[in-house]
Amino acid sequence: SQGKVRAQLMGSGTILREVLAAAELLSKDFRIPVDVWSVTSFNELRRDALEVERWNQLHPDEEPRKSYLEQCLAKRPGPYIAATDYMKIVPDQIQRWVPGSFVSLGTDGYGRSDARKALREHFEVDRHYIAVTALKALADDGALDRKTVSQAIKKYNIDPDRPDPVTL
């Protein structure tokens, strides 16, 4: 890895295991340090942030408050990748309070899978896709060479030309 390269991975519920596995892949295969965040509720993080935002708006003469999310993520470098077994819109709802680039992975579209593992692979939200997404976000932020992303795609046997699961 280069300098201060670091990724922030978020997972909610049972997909947290895939997030932890992706963190291990990033560390082992690419020497990328990762912070893993267990998100119990994207909805509650949003509600808290909106409540703090409202308080700040109605108390302009007071010291602005920070939401729980903003407090947790302050000074945490790297892009943020949020993985969920729900649609991408669920983690997307916290994006405006995240202090860096943010990518959601979720199960948008129609599933054709009989098991969770197959479902996550179909929707491109398994450990390999989480790792590749983190590498791509790091490259987009200028923290990593794009060739590293291509290497990961090959290493994890991802077909870059397969149909988008949302369109299937």
Predicted features, each with a name:
Residues S1-L168:
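Thiamine diphosphate
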